């Protein structure tokens, strides 16, 4: 069994109004050191699949559902879950 951590964020070329609003709020709270804020999504999937097919499966899920690849980038990390 594997735990897959998926991170989805807007591409650098796409305006992030939510990130801009958070940055503005932080500046109004005197956290002026913050130069940029980008908002994204984080998902954890538990998958029971052979490791041989796992990368193909995760890429397919990301590109078909979890990320809008027109405006979003994604990356993921895989860790094996050891049964106790």
From Swiss-Prot:
Main location: cytoplasm
Pathway: Purine metabolism; IMP biosynthesis via de novo pathway; 5-amino-1-(5-phospho-D-ribosyl)imidazole from N(2)-formyl-N(1)-(5-phospho-D-ribosyl)glycinamide: step 1/2
Keywords, sorted A to Z: ATP-binding, Cytoplasm, Ligase, Nucleotide-binding, Purine biosynthesis
EC number: 6.3.5.3
Enzyme class: ligase
Disruption phenotype: Cells lacking this gene show a purine auxotrophic phenotype and an accumulation of FGAR due to defective FGAM synthetase activity.
Gene3D superfamilies for the chain: Phosphoribosylformylglycinamidine synthase subunit PurS
Known role: Part of the phosphoribosylformylglycinamidine synthase complex involved in the purines biosynthetic pathway. Catalyzes the ATP-dependent conversion of formylglycinamide ribonucleotide (FGAR) and glutamine to yield formylglycinamidine ribonucleotide (FGAM) and glutamate. The FGAM synthase complex is composed of three subunits. PurQ produces an ammonia molecule by converting glutamine to glutamate. PurL transfers the ammonia molecule to FGAR to form FGAM in an ATP-dependent manner.
Family: Belongs to the PurS family.
Listed name of the protein: Phosphoribosylformylglycinamidine synthase subunit PurS
Organism annotation: Bacillus subtilis (strain 168)
Gene behind this protein: purS
